[in-house]
Amino acid sequence: MSRRLQQINLGLSACLCVSLSALAAESPTVHVYNWYDYIGPNTLHDFKRDTGIEPVYDTFDSAEVLEGKLLTSRSGYDVVVASNFSLPTLIKAGALAPLPHAQMPDFKNMDADLLAKLANNDPGNQYAVPYLWGTNGIGYNVDKVRAALGDKAPVDSWELVFNEANLAKLGQCGVAMLDSPSEMLPVALHYLGLPPNSTNPEDYKKAEALLLKLRPHIAYFNSSKFISDLANGNICVAVGWSGAMLEAKTNAEQANNGVKIAYSLPKEGAPVWFDTLVLLKDAPHPQQGLAFIDYLMRPEVIAPVSDHLNYPNGNRSATPLVAEATRNNPAVYPSAQALATLFTLQPLPPATERVRTRIWSKVKNGQ
């Protein structure tokens, strides 16, 4: 290559580098990792419009995938949406950066009651802020449950599914439960008046006995199939997530198939879960990450997300901006009285997790 050509190429390379550097300076980015289909249709577009920051957005479909990515290597992400249940593991591993609340002017909008519950997984609310949240309860076919149990069916109580006499009748029209020992065993313990996050093996023996007694009347354990089956009338009762039950209700209404679905948050109390916004300790763009988190704490930003997804957010100031039909639906926004009965789930010691895994295998197999 001639010296002249080398000089030309060097000049072009220099120009290209300068151009790319200028472009990078003009177009800051933030890398976000979220659950699939878990944001408003215009949120990312509006964030770029309002801040000038380009969101690079990827999705995952299970907490195990998220934890695997964050705990085994540098992920390259700035902000991730992590469940409250994952927080203790991520905090202990040193994967998260403390959030500088003083640099987040919209943190003041967070619901103090929800922050107090979240503190069970994130002491002092150092690492996470609520994004969206929900509950675990009972979805049911109004007409079929009435036909099976009469007008006084205890649809507002765990008695509906943990009382063997009730479940035997409901089993004729189909009952499904989550395939999740970490969610179902705490509910069984709570029904029995035992600590839902117990580490006592004797408590789990009692929960095992209860579930084995009920097993003949449960059609299946699955964490997704129940949505379509409930909407289509193939089952009449399911234990699962609030948003999933509302999805089944919406699907039935859109199909105009005559199936009436309702969601009940049992009066005895139930699990509450939070999906939270966290900043990674090795975030390549921490300031842009903070900007993204703070943006989602703006009331006018998060309210349309709740409307779109039918999940409540953790922002007290956003509630008046949420559509009336959404904010007045106790299946989406539980009352203060109901909220006081909810409990969070905790990661348990490995020995207890092994006990839960063994019990769940026996329950699913019916032996």
Model-inferred region functions:
Residues 280-341:
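Mature extracytoplasmic/periplasmic domains
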Residues 87-217, 224, 229-231:
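Extracytoplasmic ligand-binding site segments that recognize negatively charged/polar headgroups
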Residues 139-144, 190-194, 273-285, 304:
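A bilobed periplasmic-binding-protein/Venus flytrap-type ligand-binding module shared by bacterial periplasmic
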Residues 204-213, 219, 257-278, 327:
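Periplasmic-binding protein-like
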Residues 24-93:
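Early extracytoplasmic/lumenal segment of secretory-pathway proteins
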Residues 97-108, 255-271, 280-283:
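Short beta-strand->loop
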Residues 228, 336-367:
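Conserved C-terminal helix/tail region of periplasmic/extracytoplasmic solute-binding proteins
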Residues 86-89, 237-258:
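A ligand-binding cleft/hinge motif common to bilobed small-molecule-binding domains
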